[in-house]
Design a protein with these regions (language model features):
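Phosphate-binding P-loop
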Residues: 2-8
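Conserved catalytic-core segment of NTP-binding enzymes
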Residues: 3, 19, 23-27, 34-35, ...
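The Walker A (P-loop) glycine that initiates the GxxxxGKT/S ATP-binding motif of P-loop NTPases
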Residues: 15
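N-terminal phosphate/diphosphate-binding loop that engages ATP/GTP or pyrophosphate donors
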Residues: 29-100
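Flexible beta-alpha connector loops of hexameric P-loop NTPases
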Residues: 78-82, 106-114, 163-171
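ATP-hydrolysis module of ASCE/P-loop NTPase motor domains
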Residues: 86-131
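NTP-binding/hydrolysis catalytic cores, primarily Walker-type P-loop NTPases
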Residues: 278, 282-320
Length: 320
């Protein structure tokens, strides 16, 4: 799974709120940095938790290195809007005057998808300076985007195509065309959807994956996060779920707790199989990290699991 990520230059990580999308993004970034890639994590959500999970790091509009090979940055709408105006007018003083114009603010607010378009232009500039708002000294092997949750990810990814339908000609159309090519290129770009082994989460993941495929952005194998450890063998599962439990009366409260855990284990396995059948791929399962709040130590633990999952997939495929 890590190998799939390392083969790309731009990966969007998305999923239903609460599935651990940000933690998985940072764990992927950590594992990639260990593999000697220069990695940038981009936070799109203004209320995101990348900085918190890294121990209180403050994110800005320009990349900041927080660990060897690992940098972080945040999308700030005012900054990317100013860069956009500067790209058009070429003179910073004129660009700032345009931004202060009430008419421009009204037009910018009314333009559908302009924020998403500028966000993608900014991200594209970190993947390839020719796509961005301005040439940058920062160069990265891999850009990981902590993308919006399910409801907003598809409109974000669909922005270049939507803009081209409205404005098929002109400088904006040229940039939108470059972005559309970037997002649809399976050798450069992909989306990783994070989910949980729960019925509602899997249902939403299947809908999201279908929508992303319709937009034309390549998908990586789905990541099933926070999978509880397998506590029981098949024989133990059958015994625990037997009614009444095949244990002495004094142990029945303990057996009831075991039966509850066994039922959850069986349900999780069923949902992972359903997900794999529906998407015709093998999902990547990541373990539940026992922590009250995510810290750099917890992120490292999840990165270890990602590396181990990659090794298991290589062994299963017969690759050294």
């Amino acid at each position: 799974m890590l190998g799939d990520v390392l083969q790309r230059r731009l990966v969007f990580v998305t999923g239903k709120g609460g599935v651990g999308k940000t933690a998985v993004t940072l764990a992927l970034a950590t594992a990639a940095a260990r593999a000697r890639r220069r990695v940038l994590v981009v936070e799109v959500n203004p209320h995101g938790r990348v900085g918190e999970y890294l121990g209180g790091v403050t994110l800005g509009p320009e990349p900041t290195e927080v660990a060897p090979g690992l940098s972080v940055a945040a999308i700030e709408p005012t900054v990317i809007l100013e860069e956009f105006a500067l790209r058009i007018l070429r003179i910073r003083a004129l660009a700032r005057r345009l931004l202060q114009s009430q008419t421009f603010r009204i037009v910018a607010a009314a333009a559908p998808g302009i924020d998403d378009f500028l966000t993608l232009v900014r991200i594209g500039g970190w993947e390839d300076a020719r796509t961005g708002l301005q040439r940058r000294r920062h160069r990265f092997d891999l850009v990981l985007v902590d993308a919006p949750a399910t409801g907003h990810s598809v409109p974000l990814l669909a922005t270049p195509g939507s803009l081209l339908k409205m404005l098929p000609f002109g400088p904006l159309a040229g940039t939108a065309r470059e972005l559309a090519l970037l997002l649809s290129d399976p050798e450069r770009t992909a989306v990783a959807v994070v989910t949980r082994a729960e019925e509602m989460a899997v249902n939403e993941t299947l809908e999201l994956s279908a929508a992303i495929m319709r937009v034309g952005v390549p998908l990586l194998p789905t990541i099933v996060n926070a999978v509880a450890p397998l506590r029981f063998s098949r024989a133990e599962l059958r015994r625990l779920l037997k009614e009444p439990p095949d244990v002495p009366a004094s142990l029945r409260p303990l057996a009831a707790a075991g039966a509850f855990s066994a039922a959850r284990q069986r349900a999780a396995e069923r949902e992972i199989r359903r997900l794999g059948r529906a998407l015709a791929t093998t999902p990547v399962s990541l373990p539940l990290v026992a922590t009250r709040r995510f810290t750099p130590t917890a992120i490292d633990e999840l990165a270890d699991a990602i590396e181990h999952a990659g090794a298991r997939r290589r062994r299963a495929a017969g690759v050294a």
